[in-house]
From Swiss-Prot:
Gene3D superfamilies assigned to the protein according to its UniProt record, in alphabetical order: P-loop containing nucleotide triphosphate hydrolases, Probable tRNA modification gtpase trme, domain 1, tRNA modification GTPase MnmE domain 2
Keyword presence, Nucleus: no
GO MF, one annotated term: metal ion binding
GO biological process: tRNA methylation; tRNA wobble uridine modification
Self-association and partners: Homodimer. Heterotetramer of two MnmE and two MnmG subunits.
Amino acids binding GTP: 226-231, 245-251, 270-273, 335-338, 358-360
Alphabetized CDD domains for the sequence: trmE, TrmE_N
Protein name according to UniProt: tRNA modification GTPase MnmE
Length: 454
C-alpha cells in the first residue's frame, strides 16, 4: 500500500438510497474516467453519462464530476460518480474500477488526509469535517462549520505569529549581546508577552466551550435507594427512560440518556442506589455506579427530603462525600419538595449548589437545567465559536504553562536561553493544533476515526 496509489471509496452511507456516490482521487482518476465513462468530463461541470463495464454493457447511468488537481478537495485529480444508491449497483461499479491497476480502496479518512498533506486544509480544519458529520445539535454543527472555514486555525495562527515576533527579539539579544538590545528598559517585551498570554487565555476559554459542545458533559445522578434518581433522569430526559417504583433497588445497572439543554449536549447517567448490596447483581451495579462517578464531570447528589432536614452533604452522608474524587463538582438535589413543602429553587451550602425540586411533578427541574448549563460556562449566544477536541485543550494548556514559565524568566533572573526555549515550546504546542508540527502517529490516530469516503 502506497500513499501515491489512486484511491476509491463510497462517499455515501452504506445501504439503499436514492443516490450513491463513488469518489476517486489520484493519478489514475483520469484513466478511470476514460475507462468507465468513455471520455473525460468537462472540469467542474455535471455530465450525465452511462457507467460501463469492461464488455461495454451499461452498469448504471448518472452524473460524473471531474476536478483536475490541484483545484480539488484533495489537491489531486478527483472523479466523482453519482449513480443510483443500490448496494449491488455500487458494488459492481466499484469492482469495475478496481480492475484498473494501482487502484485500491481508501483507508478511513484518507481523502481528508491527502487534502491535509497537499495543504488544502490544516489539521484543525480536517478534524472539523468529522466533527461536522458527527454534530449532535444545531450549535455544534455551526461551530464545526466555523472550524472548517478556519475560525479556530486563524486564532491559533495569530498566536503563533505573535510568538514568532517575540522569539526574534529574544534570540537577537542572545546572539548579539554586544549590541546592547535592552528588553526591560521600556517594558515592551513584557507587554507583548502579556498580550499573547491574554489572547491565549481567551482562545482557551472558547476552546473549552467548543470541547463541551463536541464531547458533552457527563453528569452522574447518585445517592441512596429510593431518593428519586430515576425519576430525575426521566424528568431531564422528558420521557420514561427508567422504571420507577417504590421498591428500593429497582435500578440495578447504569442507565444513560443523551439530552440537549439549549444546544449543550449532556450525558445523564442514572446509577444503582448506593448501600450495602443484598445480592451479587446489586453489588455489581453499585461497583459500576462508582466507576461512573469517578469519571463524571459533575455529580448530582440526590437526597430524599422526607428522610432528613440536613442540607450539607458532609452531614447527610460523610462516607459518600469522603469517597468522591477530589475537586469533583457536586450539586446537592433535595427531592420530594412536593411532599416536604420546601421552597423550590437554588441556594448554596458549604461551597456546593443546593437545589430543591420535585422530580415526580417536574417542579424546580428547570432550575437544575439552568444550573447545569451555567456550571460549565456555556454561552448560547456565542457567535463565531468553534469546536475543539481534547488534544487541542491539552496543547493550549501546555502552551500557557510554557508562557508563564517564560514570563518568570523575563521578570526574574533574565535567563535569555531559557526564555527563548519556553517561547519555542509554546509555539510548538500551538503548531500541533494546525498540524505544522505533528507526529505521524498522531495523524494516523486522527484520520483513522473518519468515514471511509472522507
Amino acid at each position: 500500500m502506497s500513499d501515491n496509489d489512486t484511491i476509491v471509496a463510497q462517499a455515501t452511507p452504506p445501504g439503499r438510497g436514492g443516490v450513491g456516490i463513488l469518489r476517486i482521487s489520484g493519478l489514475k482518476a483520469r484513466e478511470v474516467a476514460e475507462t468507465v465513462l468513455g471520455k473525460l468530463p468537462k472540469p467542474r461541470y455535471a455530465d450525465y453519462l452511462p457507467f460501463k463495464d469492461a464488455d461495454g454493457s451499461v452498469l448504471d447511468q448518472g452524473i460524473a464530476l471531474w476536478f483536475p488537481g490541484p483545484n480539488s478537495f484533495t489537491g489531486e485529480d478527483v472523479l466523482e460518480l453519482q449513480g443510483h444508491g443500490g448496494p449491488v449497483i455500487l458494488d459492481l461499479l466499484l469492482k469495475r474500477i478496481l480492475t484498473i491497476p494501482d487502484l485500491r480502496i481508501a483507508r478511513p479518512g484518507e481523502f481528508s488526509e491527502r487534502a491535509f498533506l497537499n495543504d488544502k486544509l490544516d489539521l484543525a480544519q480536517a478534524e472539523a469535517i468529522a466533527d461536522l458529520i458527527d454534530a449532535s445539535s444545531e450549535q455544534a454543527a455551526r461551530s464545526a462549520l466555523n472550524s472548517l472555514q478556519g475560525a479556530f486555525s486563524a486564532r491559533v495562527n495569530h498566536l503563533v505569529e505573535a510568538l514568532t515576533h517575540l522569539r526574534i527579539y529574544v534570540e537577537a539579544a542572545i546572539d548579539f549581546p554586544d549590541e546592547e538590545i535592552d528588553f526591560l528598559s521600556d517594558g515592551k517585551i513584557e507587554a507583548q508577552l502579556n498580550d499573547v498570554i491574554a489572547d491565549l487565555d481567551a482562545v482557551r476559554a472558547e476552546a473549552r466551550q467548543g470541547s463541551l459542545l463536541r464531547e458533552g458533559m457527563k453528569v452522574v445522578i447518585a445517592g441512596r435507594p429510593n431518593a428519586g434518581k430515576s425519576s430525575l433522569l426521566n424528568a431531564l430526559a422528558g420521557r420514561e427512560a427508567a422504571i420507577v417504583t417504590d421498591i428500593a433497588g429497582t435500578t440495578r445497572d447504569v442507565l444513560r440518556e443523551h439530552i440537549h439543554i439549549d444546544g449543550m449536549p449532556l450525558h445523564i447517567i442514572d446509577t444503582a442506589g448506593l448501600r450495602e448490596a443484598s445480592d451479587e447483581v446489586e453489588r455489581i451495579g453499585i461497583e459500576r455506579a462508582w466507576q461512573e462517578i469517578e469519571q463524571a464531570d459533575r455529580v448530582l447528589f440526590m437526597v430524599d427530603g422526607t428522610t432528613t432536614d440536613a442540607v450539607d452533604p458532609a452531614e447527610i452522608w460523610p462516607e459518600f462525600i469522603a469517597r468522591l474524587p477530589a475537586k469533583l463538582p457536586i450539586t446537592v438535589v433535595r427531592n420530594k419538595a412536593d411532599i416536604t413543602g420546601e421552597t423550590l429553587g437554588m441556594s448554596e451550602v458549604n461551597g456546593h449548589a443546593l437545589i430543591r425540586l420535585s422530580a415526580r411533578t417536574g417542579e424546580g427541574v428547570d432550575v437544575l437545567r439552568n444550573h447545569l448549563k451555567q456550571s460549565m460556562g456555556f454561552d448560547t449566544n456565542m457567535e463565531g465559536g468553534f469546536l475543539a477536541r481534547r488534544r487541542h485543550l491539552q496543547a493550549l494548556e501546555q502552551a500557557a504553562e510554557h508562557l508563564q514559565q517564560g514570563k518568570a524568566q523575563l521578570l526574574g533572573a533574565w535567563a535569555g536561553e531559557l526564555l527563548a526555549e519556553e517561547l519555542r515550546l509554546a509555539q510548538q504546542n500551538l503548531s500541533e493544533i494546525t498540524g505544522e508540527f505533528t507526529s505521524d502517529d498522531l495523524l494516523g490516530r486522527i484520520f483513522s476515526s473518519f468515514c471511509i469516503g472522507k
